[in-house]
Amino acid sequence: MREPGFWHRPPSLVSRLLLPIAAIYGNIAAARMQKAGTTVGVPVLCVGNYHMGGAGKTPTTLALVALLREFGETPVVLSRGYGGRLQGPVQVDPSRHSAADIGDEPLMMARRVPVVVARDRTDGAALACALGATVILMDDGFQNPALTKDASLIVVDSHRSIGNGSVFPAGPLRAPLPLQVARTDALVVVGDGTAADGLAQQITTKGGVVLRARLVPEPASVEALRGRRVLAFAGIGDPARFVATLRDSGVEVVEQRAFADHHPFTAEELAELAAAAKRDGLTLVTTEKDLARIGGAQQALGVEIVPFAVTLAFGDEAKLRLFLLDRLNGARAAKLAGRR
């Protein structure tokens, strides 16, 4: 879905006209969020958003995977598998599954960490535990009440923040903001913008943790594009941020194409991109997530598509480590006490 422009502008007439529907949607979402969830035998850490679209959940999840492994943990990622056809629960196998089966993000992450896809998150958690998980990382699912969460980390872009602050469809929020803030343990602010400063203050006031982070291009990706003129395309939550990251890395972006988040590229669209690149002597570059959706279709194009990989770097990693250790220890103590 491509986000309406008015979501990221001050409240407009269109937004105000949609407020009655937003109130109904918000009440339903709030009631659902407050339902009791199933408690799992291992800590459950949720990485989510307040709003529709992306803000950097997947890089955040992978960064947490790396830290948890340093602690000696065995993390397994649990995903709904947005955009995939399989109901699950199923462990993602990159050699067997496609993005059409299990979604682009699970497929991309499964090359680095065990990933379970399940529409029913309780069933998915059971499979994750059977695979030996000592910690479950929920990729999205903050508003889903199926599992009791031991910590919720919310990712927000520092330039876009939460848009006009209204609930869908008047704005991008998935549920009323006060309820979401109340259930947030840590806010991960990605980038050097100031749009999320007010939100960060709300989290600090309620006793939550604010973590600053930035997306860092992997050196190999930058080197692969050195001296090349590129046509950048992406179907993610914020394609403009992808292009900005490329340019900030010194990549010469000559042309760009933006698609809706999780866009299923057709053969015709890919052929048009390939033709444009050949015509103008450009290199096609996209995100790892987009390349996961394209899959084997690129082989028929006759041109190379270069994935541009990024990782998330935290400004105060020690603060994050303390937060994670505190939550893991607290969760385990509570679960142990509950079994007595």
UniProtKB/Swiss-Prot annotation:
Pathway entry: Glycolipid biosynthesis; lipid IV(A) biosynthesis; lipid IV(A) from (3R)-3-hydroxytetradecanoyl-[acyl-carrier-protein] and UDP-N-acetyl-alpha-D-glucosamine: step 6/6
Could you tell me the Gene Ontology terms of the biological process aspect for this record?
A: lipid A biosynthetic process; lipopolysaccharide core region biosynthetic process
EC number per UniProt: 2.7.1.130
Enumerate the residues binding ATP.
Answer: H51, M52, G53, G54, A55, G56, K57, T58
The UniProt entry's GO CC annotations, sorted and at most eight, read: plasma membrane
User: What would be one Pfam family of this protein?
Assistant: LpxK
InterPro entries hit by this protein: LpxK, P-loop_NTPase
Query: Which reaction(s) are listed as its catalytic activity?
Result: a lipid A disaccharide + ATP = a lipid IVA + ADP + H(+)
**What GO molecular-function term can you cite, just one?**
tetraacyldisaccharide 4'-kinase activity
User: What keywords tag this UniProt record?
Assistant: ATP-binding, Kinase, Lipid A biosynthesis, Lipid biosynthesis, Lipid metabolism, Nucleotide-binding, Transferase
Write down the HAMAP family for this protein, in alphabetical order: LpxK
Q: Which family does it belong to?
A: Belongs to the LpxK family.
Looking up NCBIfam families in the UniProt record yields: lpxK
Q: What function does the entry list?
A: Transfers the gamma-phosphate of ATP to the 4'-position of a tetraacyldisaccharide 1-phosphate intermediate (termed DS-1-P) to form tetraacyldisaccharide 1,4'-bis-phosphate (lipid IVA).
Q: What is this protein called?
A: Tetraacyldisaccharide 4'-kinase
- Species source reads Rhodopseudomonas palustris (strain ATCC BAA-98 / CGA009)
Please name the taxonomic classification of the source: Bacteria, Pseudomonadati, Pseudomonadota, Alphaproteobacteria, Hyphomicrobiales
Q: Which gene encodes it?
A: lpxK
